[in-house]
Each structure stands twice: as structure tokens, then as C-alpha cells.
Amino acid sequence: MQLIIRIILIFILSISISSAYEIFVSLKKNKVNVRYGPSLDSEVKYVYKKINLPLKQIDKKENFRRIIDFKNNGGWIHISQLKKNNSVIATKDKILFKNPTSFAKPIALIKEGRLLILEKCEQEWCQITSGEFQGWVKTDNIWGFN
């Protein structure tokens, strides 16, 4: 019986430790290298060219963070290239509303894949800026916030 309890405790601790790394971050610069491993000596896998792009941090090792994007592409990025998350991606077409209610005046149609800058979130709504538009979107079908 004690063995079963110990196994359960180890399992619970491993889940809580791994989920502690899982936070959303954003790109600090317009050009950021994604590497195969957590080292500047590691080969560049690809390059992001979009400031504020939201990414999910899934692991960390010294000064590198392992990330995935909303399309599930992943690799390692140096922490100097990352900042606290300030954006989301629309994963489906969405309506931008003037106020945080579906009965509010629609302002614009946000297309799938559009980068949205987060202003604040309240319950199931987030206030965002997209180009010249500012308004509210429902939190379903957006990727990049905790």
C-alpha cells in the first residue's frame, strides 16, 4: 500500500513540476533564431521574423527556453529574445466587439492566424488591439494566454 502511495505522489509531483515551466511568452525582437538544442553552439533550426509572436514555453535549461508555437513547431530560444507574453493568435475567424458581450456592436472580423496584442482579459473576454482596431474577443479559439 505504501508503495502505491509513493508512486502516486511521485507522479503528482512530476506533473506539477513540468507544468510549472509551461507559460506563454512573446518574442522580443523581429528576428529570433530557434535552435535544435539549448546552446548557442547548437544549429539554427529556423528563424522567427515576427515581434510579439506568442509562444508556449514547455521546458527550460540554463539560459534557454524550449518553446512551441500555435502550429506545434518547436525548438530552443535564448531568454534574451523572449519577454512576458503580450499577444495571442486567432486560431479561427473571430468577431471583434466594441464591448465584452456578444450583444455589443461588431467592429471588425479578425481572420485566422492574425496576431493580436493583449490589453487585458476578463473572464471569457480579452481586450485586444489589431492594427487600427481595438475591441473585445471571446477567449475561445485564441492561442497564447494563460
What are these model-predicted stretches?
Residues 18-36, 46-51, 58-99, 103-132, ...:
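SH3-family beta-barrel domains
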Residues 10-20:
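Hydrophobic h-region of N-terminal signal peptides that target proteins for export
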